[in-house]
């Protein structure tokens, strides 16, 4: 059987079958049968099938990969990259929102403010973090963090992975749109360098609120859009079953975003997606973060703001 701890996506069925065959052969080898060469041959075939599959993913397949439950989340990146992390809670206005986490720590010895959506990895944690869909309190907490970071001259890192801001009645009554707008404005107005990374889903204003940064990075199989494919399908076709068609038409992939100038860099994922080797993905992300902040060293507050604003003004003007 394939690795019981690994969740295969629908389009990965050929790879799952090969992995299952490898496991069967290994069991036979463990029982004393000399089939080492056959195991190696099937393993090589499975690896090549996986590489070929992921080299030609459709936008809808990338959407499925971006949502993979075993993909590294905010807490994984923080645990792997940030030392002495001290989380802050609450927006000082209404309460705490566990969907958007943030605090201060050190990245390679230097102070850093880090924040982002946490989807959760288990049923219990997903409910606790509301599947990464932040309420107004989360975005106001983000503003609070950014204000503190600017006060102390600390750079800001955002890790974005959300299906969007929470659309519940309570959230709307407490000013969801205003909170998103203020968070977006706070990002644009920062006098310290900020770097944003879209690690999975970057949907709607809930993502934009944290990604108006000097440098925007995106994982190879992440997606970024003003709306989810399912919602676009319901609006455009009045049919929620056309999500795959919508995704293939919306230009939501990292490659699309790079061509449009929306993101600056694509971070290559391990073969088979970040969920197959989270440790390698986190390490590569750390290198990219270090390079992005290094490129912004030496800029004063005015230059930082000017570069950031011009970056967003220029989006879409030059298509490669």
UniProtKB/Swiss-Prot annotation:
PROSITE patterns xrefs: COA_CT_CTER
Pathway: Lipid metabolism; malonyl-CoA biosynthesis; malonyl-CoA from acetyl-CoA: step 1/1
Recorded GO CC terms: acetyl-CoA carboxylase complex
Keywords: ATP-binding, Cytoplasm, Fatty acid biosynthesis, Fatty acid metabolism, Lipid biosynthesis, Lipid metabolism, Nucleotide-binding, Transferase
Protein EC: 2.1.3.15
Catalytic activity: N(6)-carboxybiotinyl-L-lysyl-[protein] + acetyl-CoA = N(6)-biotinyl-L-lysyl-[protein] + malonyl-CoA
Major enzyme class: transferase
Localization per record: Cytoplasm
GO BP term, pick one: malonyl-CoA biosynthetic process
CoA carboxyltransferase C-terminal domain residues: 41-295
Domain of life from the UniProt record: Bacteria
Gene3D superfamilies: 2-enoyl-CoA Hydratase, Chain A, domain 1
GO molecular function, one term: acetyl-CoA carboxylase activity
Job description of the protein: Component of the acetyl coenzyme A carboxylase (ACC) complex. First, biotin carboxylase catalyzes the carboxylation of biotin on its carrier protein (BCCP) and then the CO(2) group is transferred by the carboxyltransferase to acetyl-CoA to form malonyl-CoA.
PANTHER family documented for this protein: ACETYL-COENZYME A CARBOXYLASE CARBOXYL TRANSFERASE SUBUNIT ALPHA, ACETYL-COENZYME A CARBOXYLASE CARBOXYL TRANSFERASE SUBUNIT ALPHA, CHLOROPLASTIC
Family, per entry: Belongs to the AccA family.
Subunit structure: Acetyl-CoA carboxylase is a heterohexamer composed of biotin carboxyl carrier protein (AccB), biotin carboxylase (AccC) and two subunits each of ACCase subunit alpha (AccA) and ACCase subunit beta (AccD).
Protein's recorded name: Acetyl-coenzyme A carboxylase carboxyl transferase subunit alpha
Organism ancestry: Bacteria, Pseudomonadati, Pseudomonadota, Alphaproteobacteria, Hyphomicrobiales
